[in-house]
Regions:
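Bacterial N-terminal signal peptides
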Residues: 12-22
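Bacterial N-terminal signal peptides that target proteins for export
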Residues: 2-12
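N-terminal leader/targeting segments
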Residues: 3-4, 17, 29
Length: 304
């Protein structure tokens, strides 16, 4: 087909218009990007009725303290009972949420204190130092991989828990000094047992969930034997109540070792120790804490 000068001019003008428009079209945001631009600004979630601060121990070790406490209203007579939760970065939120939604019940008229470490990790390697006895030299084969990390500060950590931290909580909140409880899981559960054996009057209730009793060739058994000897000799007096928790699908050997521990400690009931075992079918080492939350709160905060 032959084109005339007028036709060629019209086509040129049309093409110029097309290419003039294309860059503008390319500049338009993709549908997904446009949708993203339209989203409202987000913000971090802050759990109601909670406070967080960092504080140092006497030796300068830094800890992050998480607290869930009732807001408003009168505290119970004698003050609020307190549950200290080890590995607070990992477990505080679960316990705090359960306490908060039950605040209208007696179990919720209480304070949960999570003890953790600055940072956003669920677990900090420093827990191994704070919760354990000094690793033997040479280390047992099953704990040799841990030899690169510090261990053995459990006594100093217990002093921090029962001294400076407890005093700080009492300054900030009306607490009942006669209703103080401790929860720990895994290494934290091992520390909870140590707290019972070393300072049996420091906490009125202790919960040891899936305690890592195999640590350091079961050196915690030495502490248990010394504690039992003091108990049967009448040298302890009043002592904590103890709740042991294990999952039936916990790591190899754990459920059985915890059951045997419960049997041994229950024999001390004649000397004042009240110990019981709670087992969860189908729960593993990692799932026990979530399953245990309400059982722990009831054990810690029930009226006795």
């Amino acid at each position: 087909m032959m084109t005339t000068p007028h036709t060629r001019a019209a086509i040129a003008a049309l093409m110029a218009g097309v290419f003039t428009c294309v860059p503008g079209a390319w500049a338009q945001p993709a549908p997904a990007a446009a949708a993203a631009q339209a989203l409202p600004a987000s913000m971090p979630y802050v759990m109601p009725s909670t406070q967080v601060w960092d504080m140092a121990s006497a030796s300068g070790e830094m800890y992050r303290i998480f607290v869930s406490a009732p807001v408003g209203g009168e505290p119970p007579r004698g003050g609020y009972p307190v549950l200290y939760v080890l590995d607070g970065n990992a477990y505080f939120a679960s316990f705090a949420q359960a306490r908060w939604v039950q605040e209208y019940l007696p179990i919720g008229k209480s304070i949960v204190v999570g003890v953790g470490y600055p940072g956003d990790k669920a677990w900090d390697v420093r827990r191994m130092n704070d919760y354990t006895a000094q690793l033997r030299d040479p280390p047992p084969p099953e704990t040799r991989a841990y030899a690169q990390h510090k261990s053995g500060a459990r006594q100093e950590f217990l002093e921090f828990m029962t001294g400076k931290l407890r005093a700080e909580i009492a300054l900030r909140y009306p607490v009942n000094p006669e209703r103080q409880s401790l929860f720990g899981h895994s290494f934290g559960g091992l520390f909870a047992l140590y707290a019972l054996y070393e300072r049996p009057q420091a906490f009125q209730s202790i919960i040891a969930a899936s305690p890592s009793m195999e640590w350091n060739a079961q050196s915690i058994l030495d502490d248990e034997r010394a504690f039992s000897a003091r108990m049967t000799a009448g040298k302890v007096g009043s002592t904590s109540r103890l709740l042991l928790i294990a999952g039936d699908r916990d790591t190899a050997g754990d459920p059985e070792s915890v059951r045997l521990l419960a049997d041994r400690l229950q024999r001390l009931s004649g000397w004042g120790l009240r110990a019981r075992l709670l087992r969860y079918p189908n729960e593993t080492h990692g799932s026990v804490p979530a399953q245990s939350v309400n059982d722990v709160l009831r054990f810690a905060f029930e009226q006795r």
